[in-house]
Amino acid sequence: MRTDRGTVTAWALWDWGSAAFNAVLVTFIFSVYLTDSVGATLDSRFTPTTLYGWVMAVAGVLIAVVAPLIGQRADLKGTRHRSLGVWTFITIGLMASLFFVRNDAPVWFWVGAVIMAVASVLFEFAEVNYYAQLNQVSTEENVGRVSGFGWGRGYAGGIVLLFICDFGFVAGECG
């Protein structure tokens, strides 16, 4: 068990980097693009936001059922670190694939929604392993401080990335 400053910082940087998923994709930018722009092509009695909510709800149920099993498996096999890397790598690939979601046909809404749902499930699998490592990078005396340090890095990463997205991409399209 390494609890030195470098190990804790490396652990917390995953939170910094993973903030891109929740801040940019799930909450503020891609989900809005998917429901407001891509979803405008849908011919449905339900709004795109409702349909997207249902898809993400299915993902949430899957997370609730499967994530504990994924975490338990990684704990028993001692593969937390490797599992974190694998789930993160696959999530990054899914995030990159969202680049190809266009707003010119209804099928793209469903492609984007399914990719987001799968990515959400796999991202949470990664988070299970990330949080399970907290006991490996902290002691009983500093677990709260280390956890808060990681949590704070996550928020900071999300804010920085949202500024980059807003000023680098979104604001340019609005003005």
Predicted regions and their residues:
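Hydrophobic alpha-helical segments of secondary membrane carriers
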Residues: 14, 54-55, 87, 115, ...
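Loop-to-transmembrane helix entry/capping segments in MFS-fold secondary transporters
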Residues: 46-50, 138-151
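Intracellular juxtamembrane helix-capping segments at the cytosolic ends
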Residues: 123-139
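Helix-loop boundary and gating motifs at the non-cytosolic
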Residues: 1-60, 109
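C-terminal ends and interior cores of transmembrane alpha-helices
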Residues: 64, 84-106
